[in-house]
């Protein structure tokens, strides 16, 4: 959705991909806007990795971007317990490497970090805001909080236009099938087609703030379009239980 929005404005978009990112590349190729832009040379994909600072330094020097949207990293809570070091390397230290590449090569670039509501842990107040105390309870949230603090440090220490969106859940048909919203939608479709008889889920009581992914893209663009870099909570302000879904 972000690439589509930028391309629709006539922007030139550069994306970072890994050698193993075949699924993501195929999804981009399937989108008419992206496929046409790629053919016209306005969408360019580059091999790089958040664990490799030299590749990030080279890419930033070559592209000289006006804006950077940092959405990459290991972002699944359960996986972060299975792969805590990898989560820290990509989600936490990957942000450090990217900020350093910006500071050293393109300090005028506007930088957006996709942070997460997971940093609030089990908050005592609802709804949460930019001033709600943070207390992460999983490795993914801890890595994102480190990344968020780095954004604030680099903004203050080096004067970078570095800002973050503290994002609550945002859903779409493009969401990975290992997330509960897609599990429910996919399960319902398969039952309707007679391919399955039952849908098995865990506890139905957790409440989440679920929003529409394209709306969050508008929020990201607004954060970088602001006069000054600040961090903002992006959410709908309404929660629903899994059972409601």
Segment roles from a protein language model:
Residues 124-127, 149-225, 237-242:
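NAD(P)-dependent short-chain dehydrogenase/reductase
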Residues 1-170, 224, 243:
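N-terminal Rossmann-like NAD(P)+-binding domain of SDR-like oxidoreductases, especially those catalyzing
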Residues 234:
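Conserved metal-phosphate-binding beta-hairpin within the catalytic cores
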Residues 228-230:
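His-Asp-centered acyl/peptidyl-transfer active-site segments
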